[in-house]
């Protein structure tokens, strides 16, 4: 089904978010050089992951709307992933399944949409301009196409600045989950002008 030109999905707001505690380290002290071998090794370790999944809390805040939801992100192979957003009652508000050249999205009424661009699809259907193509790397603690970034004292990403298509995103990492190897982001915040996206990961399962 072709995409409509209007906002279709409005996610139910959550009054409160309950997060599962995990072992988190926060950035401390001066950052390390992006040219360091430790950073190159960390990137390689993350890229070597074939499958991973994480769940947690999602918030989108702008002058136009405020959305709070739970999310589940599962990567099953290269360029194959699944994203769920659920409301306070646990019902699915949005399910997105992506593979090379084909993206399918099902809304909370069971309506199915198809496209070849997940980022564009979510933006049109929800009114939230989420940089999904870049977020797939950022959520792993990788800079993606960004070249302007900083590391913390543990040779992990602490901040990213990235401009594309008129958007100027700044990504700040608030800590890492050290229960996984390699350590994975535990919370992060994306900002562009008056809009903010917050993600808090309860846990990671990596393979």
From Swiss-Prot:
Keywords: Cell outer membrane, Chaperone, Lipoprotein, Membrane, Palmitate, Protein transport, Signal, Transport. A lipid is attached at residue 22 (N-palmitoyl cysteine). Residues 1-21 form the signal peptide. A lipid is attached at residue 22 (S-diacylglycerol cysteine). One of its GO terms (cellular component) is cell outer membrane. It is a lipid-anchor. Gene3D superfamilies: Lipoprotein localisation LolA/LolB/LppX. NCBIfam families: lolB (TIGR00548). Plays a critical role in the incorporation of lipoproteins in the outer membrane after they are released by the LolA protein. This is Outer-membrane lipoprotein LolB.
């Amino acid at each position: 089904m072709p995409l409509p030109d209007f906002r279709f999905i409005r996610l139910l707001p959550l009054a409160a978010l309950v997060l599962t505690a995990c072992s988190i380290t926060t950035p401390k002290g001066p950052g390390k050089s992006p040219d360091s071998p430790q950073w190159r090794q960390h990137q390689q370790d993350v890229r070597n992951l074939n499958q991973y999944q994480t769940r947690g809390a999602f918030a989108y805040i702008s002058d136009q709307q405020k959305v709070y939801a739970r999310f589940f992100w599962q990567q099953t192979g290269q360029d194959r992933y699944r994203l769920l957003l659920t409301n306070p009652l646990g019902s699915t508000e949005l399910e997105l399944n992506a593979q090379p050249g084909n993206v399918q999205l099902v809304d909370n009424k069971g309506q199915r949409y198809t496209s070849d661009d997940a980022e564009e699809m979510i933006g049109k259907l929800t009114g939230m301009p989420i940089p999904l193509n870049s977020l797939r790397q950022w959520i792993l603690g990788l800079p993606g196409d960004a070249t302007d970034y900083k590391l913390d004292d543990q040779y992990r990403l602490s901040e990213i600045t990235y401009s594309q298509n008129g958007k100027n995103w700044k990504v700040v990492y608030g800590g890492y989950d050290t229960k996984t190897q390699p350590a994975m982001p535990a919370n992060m915040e994306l900002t562009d002008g008056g809009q903010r996206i917050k993600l808090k990961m309860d846990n990671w399962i990596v393979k």
